[in-house]
Regions:
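A short, internal acetyl-CoA/4′-phosphopantetheine-binding micro-motif in the GNAT/acyltransferase core
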Residues: 174, 192-196, 208-219, 385-393
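Short amphipathic alpha-helix that is part of the acyltransferase structural core
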Residues: 4, 8, 12, 18-37, ...
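Classical protein tyrosine phosphatase
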Residues: 227-243
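Active-site/acyl-donor-binding loops of N-acyltransferases
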Residues: 2-14, 22-98, 104, 108, ...
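Membrane-interfacial loop- and helix-cap regions that link adjacent transmembrane helices
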Residues: 307-321, 340-341, 355-378
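Short amphipathic alpha-helical segments embedded in low-complexity Lys/Glu-rich regions
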Residues: 147-158, 244-251, 329-336, 415-423
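Conserved acetyl-CoA-binding loop-helix of GNAT-fold acetyltransferases
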Residues: 213-232, 391-403
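Conserved beta-hairpin
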Residues: 167-189, 339, 344-363
């Protein structure tokens, strides 16, 4: 009995100690709670930090490491495109479905006083000259203001007047110059019809390109008005979808691609600061490293001719179908886009013993003005278009493309990491560029697409 009573006493003392400890713990918890209690302002700031972290992570996923998602997109937040900060109710297909041509405004959007709409007719030399000069002075340039795209007049006419184009989709905004008593272009946007297959669904849509506003008036927010006006005109043709690219991160790309560059004229590229020599390499070693043989590693390539259109059409059609998102062409479009034109498009074919085209190379010419160099005025860049092999190695095919571009006096060969292009970059000494090109659909939700699954080149 004594042992039991003694045990009870010990339990009682233990319970007292436990109660004391619990009280102290509760006291500490209360103190801790009071110590770390946040004000409403602190909570708001913390939530804002979490939001920024989430947006930064999203930017890396859909854009690039240098991309930043803005807290608000005043224009794009109102458009039928997937948004960064909300779940899209549509997993695939149209977002805005309730559309009818008869509900559209028949008149163009209202512009500020002194500005007016004007369609651009590229068959008229005066209008062609005005558009060329406007784009040459105001279109895309790099962040360091060293290079600016310089699309030639012939290139613009080729690109903007394809088979089936609509003249009213080439839109400018003009403003009267009272001193010179003439009207000048201050804004431009273009649309051309294209056919695209998106994960098995064929769609005819508009490719939006050459959105450009004069530098001095960019604060007037003319770009959204240009986009809305070309959209209105496209809708009048009962077309409700668009595809476009941008180096800027917008809501929301379905594919992020990267440019890679292969030096052809090393000395010039270093002189104009397009590229730099590694610390452990002098000019002589660099020239030797990037030197290309005069002869092609594969014999039999010749410039594409009219007689090759049918074969190239079949080759392109079979090749493009291997990709989840791809364009497709009619025979008339194959002839337009791929038959060689000096300083515009270069295409080569290789045939077998039966004179059937088995392999195909193409690249287009897009020079840039060099803005800060007294010696050089123009950078000649070849841009990879479509390259298809069925009877040779892809690496050998692409090496042929480099040699052919070098023979045409191009300084650099540029290539996106789409299709199977990336498989040869290391072996053929391509270097990664410092920017990304994002692909977007307007009013169409497409699953995220890897570059290798994309066969769509927008110029």
């Amino acid at each position: 009995m004594e042992d039991k009573e003694e045990g009870k006493e010990e339990n009682k003392e233990g319970n007292n100690n436990k109660e004391k400890t619990d009280n102290e713990n509760n006291k500490n918890k209360n103190n801790t709670s009071k110590k770390f209690e946040m004000t409403e302002e602190q909570k708001k700031a913390l939530m804002e930090t979490f939001k920024k972290m989430s947006l930064a992570r999203k930017a890396r996923e859909v854009g690039g490491y240098d991309d930043v998602i803005k807290p608000e997109y005043k224009f794009w937040g109102t458009q039928p495109v997937p948004q960064f900060n909300e779940e899209c109710k549509t997993e695939f297909g149209e977002i805005w479905k309730d559309h009818k041509v008869e509900d559209l405004d028949k008149e163009p959007l209202t512009l500020p006083e002194g500005y007016e709409w004007k369609d651009v007719d590229l068959s008229k030399q005066v209008e062609m000259d005005k558009l060329y000069e406007f784009l040459k002075s105001n279109y895309v340039e790099d962040d360091d203001h060293m290079f600016r795209f310089d699309y030639s007049k012939d290139f613009l006419k080729w690109h903007l007047n394809p088979p089936g184009y609509f003249p009213e989709w080439l839109i400018s905004v003009v403003k009267e110059d009272k001193i010179k008593n003439k009207k000048k272009i201050v804004g431009f946007i273009a649309g051309i019809p294209v056919k695209v297959n998106i994960h098995g669904t064929d769609i005819t849509l508009v490719e939006i390109d050459f959105l450009c506003v004069k530098k001095e008036i960019r604060s007037k927010r003319l770009a959204p008005v240009l986009i809305q006006e070309v959209a209105r005109r496209v809708h009048m043709r009962n077309m409700w979808w668009a595809v476009y690219t941008s180096g800027t991160l917008l809501p929301t790309p379905f594919c992020k691609t990267t440019y890679y560059h292969r030096n052809l004229n090393v000395k010039k590229l270093v002189d104009i600061e397009f590229t730099n020599l590694p610390h452990n390499m002098n000019m002589a070693r660099a020239i030797k490293k990037y030197d290309l043989p005069k002869d092609l590693p594969i014999s039999g390539f010749r410039p594409m001719e009219e007689k090759d259109v049918d074969d190239v059409f079949i080759l392109l059609d079979e090749y493009e179908k291997k990709h989840k998102v791809h364009g497709y062409y009619s025979k008339e479009e194959v002839a337009h886009w791929f038959l060689p034109r000096k300083n515009i498009i270069y295409s080569y074919v290789r045939t077998n013993d039966s004179n059937k085209v088995t392999d195909f190379i193409s690249f287009y010419c897009l020079p840039s003005s060099i803005l800060q160099n007294p010696k050089y005025k123009k950078l000649m860049a070849a841009y990879s278009f479509f390259n298809i092999n069925t009877s040779c190695e892809f690496k050998d095919l692409m090496k042929c493309a480099l040699i052919l571009a070098k023979k045409e006096n191009f300084d650099v060969y540029n290539c996106l990491n789409i299709m199977e292009n990336e498989t040869v970059f290391k072996d053929l000494l391509f270097g990664q560029g410092d920017g990304t090109l994002k692909y977007y659909f307007w009013n169409f939700v497409c699953p995220k697409t890897e570059p290798k699954d994309l066969s769509l080149v927008l110029m």
